[in-house]
Amino acid sequence: MAKEPVRVLVTGAAGQIGYALVPMIARGIMLGADQPVILHMLDIPPAAEALNGVKMELIDAAFPLLKGVVATTDAVEGCTGVNVAVMVGGFPRKEGMERKDVMSKNVSIYKSQAAALEKHAAPNCKVLVVANPANTNALILKEFAPSIPEKNISCLTRLDHNRALGQISERLSVPVSDVKNVIIWGNHSSSQYPDVNHAKVQTSSGEKPVRELVKDDAWLDGEFISTVQQRGAAIIKARKLSSALSAASSACDHIRDWVLGTPEGTFVSMGVYSDGSYSVPSGLIYSFPVTCRNGDWSIVQGLPIDEVSRKKMDLTAEELKEEKDLAYSCLS
């Protein structure tokens, strides 16, 4: 029996990340090689023509799994009946802009998109926020879509997680698929804490801790962390454009693991609503190590946290509290 198509919304679909993401979804990379999809692409009116061009290309690519394309600038049409929503659209910070100006633009975008999703998305729609500030945009969306369960609203830190895996893989000259269980704690910003204390590498003699194999704590506690934290900026410097291919790929990884489950013994990083685990204040969307099964994520419990890690985890939580306060001040 062929599966029923899943409706996937991509906002900001005419942009760089959208252009990288929609073919991945249409090829089955996000939801599996046997899962038909109907793509809903939403963008702002000035991007309508470009959006239509992307729709033409999707049709021209003749993807067997793609059962329909909705390209629209109307939020109601874009959100109607969607099972998965990937929120890529947002207002990027431009030179000379104050943080508060950017925040207030994004607060109004996410407030209105929350309302459209709440009214028109399919029940149990899973939402992934990619646009920056991702954690706080997701928090605003949660506030203004109270009927969407909080466990269904997440933000993307899988890009940071994958960047951390990539750095370890390069350092040890091993395939990235042999590295697992790095953790990104906190905000998707340069205050995030990439933690390798629980990470493992598959070797010919079984799994070994990353620290044991790298044998260079100064690198792991210094350059490794700053490289992962600053990677987005490094890519902008090199490409003159922000990372799109890697962001799109990690968004697919995030949704795929969430819907289809994480491999046994592996955890991944997701920005989710804090329940107070690891003494992270509740009321924030914070990146935690999670496992997924049957379409639900759970925070990995009981990992030992040393004093150095604790400080870094608290620091990024502080930044998230500040962002939250700033966002709420834009609402009043």
Curated annotation (Swiss-Prot):
EC numbers listed for it are: 1.1.1.37
Q: Name one GO cellular component term.
A: cytosol
Residues bound to oxaloacetate are R99, N132, R163, H188, S243
> How is the activity of this chain controlled?
Decreased activity upon treatment with hydrogen peroxide.
Locate the cross-link: Glycyl lysine isopeptide (Lys-Gly) (interchain with G-Cter in ubiquitin): K119
Q: Molecular function terms in GO for this entry?
A: L-malate dehydrogenase (NAD+) activity; mRNA binding
| Compartment list | Cytoplasm
| Its job | Catalyzes a reversible NAD-dependent dehydrogenase reaction involved in central metabolism and redox homeostasis between organellar compartments.
Name of the protein: Malate dehydrogenase 1, cytoplasmic
- This chain is encoded by the gene named MDH1
